[in-house]
């Protein structure tokens, strides 16, 4: 016969059965929390009228419970179980909401809220999920450079402290990189910190670059799950130096090759379009089969015209990859014959030649006493006015600074030549006597009166121009006198005399010499007259030819008319004879 148990035993038994079996119908409830935040878990149960107390527990992986918090409905007191990982982290409110501060990865568990009455136990499970945003990904262990046609490690993309773990993606210019055999290789790995349970993700990229990757940005991203869903964080851009071989060689000349002249320094610069550019080249000079090894520049100093020719440079290890250029060293030679100081006698012949030798057509300018001449000088018979400083100057317009000049200082000497003239003043009270002197060096003039032999100092002289000048005196002689003019220079002493009648005796005046300026005017007038006469003669000749052609044509026409008239007369006579015969 079975005995009946006590009421307390019966209650404990019912509670155990309820805790183990009775799980009223609330479904799973999930609370998402960020790492380090406070986890708040409502009980989600209606508080019954006869509530004795409330408890929170979590379940171990094997299903065994661990109680962590207790609150009595009557004493309003809270008790926390001695669980080391939750010490000083728990808070249980009056409505049995459990809060856990400083959320950790280890808090990812199934927590259960239990409300206990005298005859029942009510439970509401809550699943806690903890998320940790990973650090911003960064590209580390970057390659110093990438080489074309070589599969080489570009770098590692690393993102730390993530929970749960995330995925890393590589991008080239914003487009996703996918593994391609021999061209793109991606190796992903993740590690978990035993203490924090946080993940570190690393993705290594090996990449075969091309020249199209120059200045192309590479990035990576990490995609992870957070409390609000999936998110992505991008790294900073990384741009890599792309190494590629030289495909073309160019050669430059400094200064520009169209302006090189003798005496200049020439620098040849050879460039390759590879990266990095070649540092050394072979330079080949005109007429030299062997090259000269140098850096990317080679300098020739004080070049001469024989440096004109073809210059070439090439890569050290690829002689067929070369470039060439033609250099012309411009030159300009000038030879003036005669040059320097030349002394000639008046009337002499002096041929002058200015010979130019240049790398291209040069301009030639003649100057006399700083005045430009229209043509080069030529002296078939030297005059005093031909004396002066002559300069032959030549230049190459295309080449700055290339000009030459030579000078000729021409001295025309002559013995003194004298001509004396006299002229009576219209008033008849005085006479002007002029001594015209020509010669070089400038002759000195002296006047004397025959008889007395006295020297006359009261004279007036003209300027000495082109080897000529004159000296004049004005006298009023009471009797006939003879005036003597003496001209002397380093070459000779010349004397001339002139008889002058007394003022009371009329005499014929002698005309003055024509000055150089007047002589030129006379020559110009003579040329003009000759031109007019020649023009008139040509006009008369043309008129004569036209008249002759006209007369010839007129005579021909007259013959034709007379012939026609004769034929008409003959026809008339024939008609008359015919009439007579019929009668």
UniProtKB/Swiss-Prot annotation:
Keyword Signal: yes
GO CC annotation terms, alphabetical: axon; dendrite; external side of plasma membrane; immunological synapse; neuronal cell body; plasma membrane; T cell receptor complex
Residue ranges of domain Ig-like V-type in the record: 28-120, 125-234
PANTHER family per record: CD166 ANTIGEN (PTHR11973:SF2), CELL SURFACE GLYCOPROTEIN MUC18-RELATED (PTHR11973)
Ranges for domain Ig-like C2-type: 245-328, 333-409, 416-501
Top-level division of the source organism's lineage: Eukaryota
CDD domains assigned to the protein according to its UniProt record, in alphabetical order: Ig (cd00096), IgC1 (cd00098)
Glycosylation sites (chain numbering): 95, 167, 265, 306, 361, 457, 480, 499
Disordered: region residues: 562-583
Tissue: Strongest expression in the lung, then brain, liver, and kidney. Present in the somatosensory system, basal ganglia, cortex, olfactory system, and circumventricular organs.
Compartments, record wording: Cell membrane; Cell projection, Axon; Cell projection, Dendrite
GO molecular function, one term: identical protein binding
Gene3D superfamilies, per the entry: Immunoglobulins
Primary site of residence: membrane
Modifications made to the protein after synthesis: The N-terminus is blocked. Glycosylated.
Domain observations: The CD6 binding site is located in the N-terminal Ig-like domain.
Chain ranges on the Cytoplasmic side, renumbered to this chain: 550-583
Subunit structure: Homodimer. Interacts (via extracellular domain) with CD6 (via extracellular domain). Homodimerization and interaction with CD6 involve the same region and cannot occur simultaneously. The affinity for CD6 is much higher than the affinity for self-association. Interacts (via glycosylated extracellular domain) with LGALS1 and LGALS3. Interaction with LGALS1 or LGALS3 inhibits interaction with CD6.
Bilayer disposition of the protein: Single-pass type I membrane protein
Designated name of the protein: CD166 antigen
Organism annotation: Rattus norvegicus
UniProt keyword terms in alphabetical order: Adaptive immunity, Cell adhesion, Cell membrane, Cell projection, Disulfide bond, Glycoprotein, Immunity, Immunoglobulin domain, Membrane, Repeat, Signal, Transmembrane, Transmembrane helix
């Amino acid at each position: 016969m079975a005995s009946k148990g006590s009421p307390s035993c019966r209650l404990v038994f019912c509670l155990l059965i309820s805790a183990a079996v009775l799980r009223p119908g609330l479904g799973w409830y999930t609370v998402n929390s960020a790492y380090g935040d406070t986890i708040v878990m409502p009980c989600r149960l209606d508080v019954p009228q006869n509530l004795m107390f409330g408890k929170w527990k979590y379940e171990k992986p094997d299903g065994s419970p661990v109680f962590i918090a207790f609150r009595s409905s009557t004493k309003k007191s809270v008790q926390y179980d001695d669980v080391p990982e939750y010490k000083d982290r728990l808070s249980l409110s009056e409505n049995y909401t459990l809060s856990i501060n400083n959320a950790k990865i280890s808090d990812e568990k199934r927590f259960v809220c239990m409300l206990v009455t005298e005859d029942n136990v009510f439970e509401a499970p809550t699943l806690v999920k903890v998320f940790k945003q990973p650090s911003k990904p960064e590209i580390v262990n970057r390659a110093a450079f990438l080489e074309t046609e070589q599969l080489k490690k570009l770098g590692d993309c690393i993102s730390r402290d993530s929970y749960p773990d995330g995925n890393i993606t590589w991008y080239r210019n914003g487009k996703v990189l996918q593994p391609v055999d021999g061209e793109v290789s991606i190796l992903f790995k993740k590690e978990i910190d035993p203490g924090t349970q946080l993940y570190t993700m690393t993705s290594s990229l090996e990449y075969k670059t091309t020249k199209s990757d120059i200045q192309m940005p590479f990035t990576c991203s990490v995609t992870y799950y957070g409390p609000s869903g999936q998110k992505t964080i991008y790294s900073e851009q990384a741009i890599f130096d792309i190494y590629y071989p030289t495909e073309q060689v160019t050669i430059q000349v400094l200064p520009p090759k169209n302006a090189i002249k003798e005496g200049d320094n020439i620098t040849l610069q050879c460039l390759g379009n590879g990266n990095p550019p070649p540092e050394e080249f072979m330079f080949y000079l005109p007429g030299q089969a062997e090259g000269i090894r140098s850096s990317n520049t080679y300098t020739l100093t004080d070049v001469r015209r024989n440096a004109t020719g073809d210059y070439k440079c090439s890569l050290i290890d690829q002689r067929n990859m070369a470039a060439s250029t033609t250099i012309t060293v411009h030159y300009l030679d000038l030879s003036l014959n005669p040059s320097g100081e030349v002394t000639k006698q008046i009337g002499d012949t002096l041929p002058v030649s200015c010979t130019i030798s240049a790398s291209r057509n040069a301009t030639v300018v003649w100057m006399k006493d700083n005045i430009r001449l229209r043509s080069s000088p030529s002296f078939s018979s030297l005059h005093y006015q031909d004396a002066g400083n002559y300069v032959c100057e030549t230049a190459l317009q295309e080449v700055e600074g290339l000009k030459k000049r030579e000078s000729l200082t021409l001295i025309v000497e002559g013995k003194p030549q004298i001509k004396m003239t006299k002229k009576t003043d219209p008033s008849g009270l005085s006479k002007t006597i002029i001594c015209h002197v020509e010669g070089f060096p400038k002759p000195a003039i002296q006047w004397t009166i025959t008889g007395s032999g006295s020297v006359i100092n009261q004279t007036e002289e003209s300027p000495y121009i082109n080897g000529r000048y004159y000296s004049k005196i004005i006298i009023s002689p009471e009797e006939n006198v003879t005036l003597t003019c003496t001209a002397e220079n380093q070459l000779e002493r010349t004397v001339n005399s002139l008889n002058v009648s007394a003022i009371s005796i009329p005499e014929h005046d002698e005309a003055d010499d024509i000055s150089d300026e007047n002589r030129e005017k006379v020559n110009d007038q003579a040329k003009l007259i000759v031109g007019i006469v020649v023009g008139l003669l040509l006009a008369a000749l043309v008129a004569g030819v036209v008249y002759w052609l006209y007369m010839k044509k007129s005579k021909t026409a007259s013959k034709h008319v007379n012939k026609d008239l004769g034929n008409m007369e003959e026809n008339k006579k024939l008609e008359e004879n015919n009439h007579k015969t019929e009668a």
